[in-house]
Amino acid sequence: MPGLDGAYYWIQVRSLLENSSLAFSDLPLVIYVQAGIARLLNDIPSAVRISDAILPALSAFPIYLIARRYPIRLLPAVGIAFVLLNPVQLFFFTGDFIKNEAAIPLVFLLSWILLSWDERGARSRYAMAGTTILAISFSHFGTLLLTLMILSFWLLVRIRQKQIKIRPLAIGIVILSGLLVVLMLALVVPSRFTRLTTFISNPGDIFILPAWRAIFYGYANPVIACTIILCQIGSILLGVIAWKIRSTFSISEISVVWSSLIVAFVLSSPIIGIDWFNRLAALAFVPLAVSGILIFAKSLTVSQRSLIGALAVITLLASASLSLRGPTPPVLSESRYSDFKEFAKTVDLPENSIVVASHGMEFLSSWLLATDVASDAYYETSCLSSYSAIFLLIDKHVGVASDKPSSAGASDKPATSGESDKPADSNKKPVCKNQIPPEGAKVFVGNEFVLVQVR
């Protein structure tokens, strides 16, 4: 499993199958799907890998439904290729952001529902949209944010086109829906609720260390840098063409086109802080793909379609060139992972223990040692007083680090298992102050790793 967070899903599925609960508090829908596959196969790692391969490909179905509305023979195939071969899908989400990519087909499905909004009765369209949004709400927080942005701008365009009248009842329904989403996060995933309240109370944090600086100074993820350039240029180019041919769109089409373009442009803005940008910009290709399909289908001239086609081709070429970099590296090489597995067999931890390890290694540690874990990045601010013993996993070659950092950026996973309803938050004052002593008892020593007891 590539990336830093691949083993995270193994732990979650195992905990769900064995304990009927998650090891880390999280939105559960995708993990429930993985657990169902694991029960059928009796193989958790294979189940997670299968979900990582198959769930994103489900986007092909709603894309086909969107594109087949227009009499252009190859449009469905080109639209599907643009999405499934997008470098974000292939190289950024794989392994680390499985929940993101698994929820993306639902966003495409919602776009199709909005596109055909006026073709259905009120009961049918509200039921379909509500069910889809509910499924997204239980899949991934970032994808839910994308969905709410699309819906908000879609609603504004519909109001401007006088297709929706503002009524007290409608306003009440919107407010109630928002409160229900917030309540769901507070009850199901307290850590996500904490992040939401932190964002609301400190909205300026989203602009700290803007992405353009990362690109300018050369430390930006190549996939993300590519996403910024393509999404910003693509949004402007498609917006100009859409404005020129605006009279050819139906109300349903123009509502989806403008809302999708605005969201794609906002999410890929280089002024967003790099930590947020790694999560938000990666989703921008979804609304960009939807708007691109609709604008291409309605374009009036060969030159307009050529420009849109060129954008799609450049995206696919970027995908091909990035593939030469190889897959996202795993936390450990095969040989070092084999050594770590042998090392884990020699470890016998006492009850009520926790292992502190570098990001990525904490998930592999939990998987192989069957214990609670914490990331070393949050060690000093995590309250671990309830544990009888604390161990620190050290790599003999690089201290607490792993082989090679993932290109995915910072993790959005909870910092500590076992007490996942009380996640550590680096923006808050520490509840407990933990100090790593200069020397500890080396209780387990392997060829590559050492386990030190610090308390």
Give residue ranges: language-model regions.
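Membrane-interface helix-loop-helix junctions at transmembrane boundaries of multi-pass membrane enzymes
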Residues: 121, 161-171, 236-263, 268, ...
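Signature aromatic-anchored transmembrane alpha helix within multi-pass, membrane-resident enzymes
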Residues: 172-176, 296-324
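Extracytoplasmic catalytic/substrate-binding loops of multi-pass membrane glycan-assembly enzymes
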Residues: 1-12, 22-36, 331-339
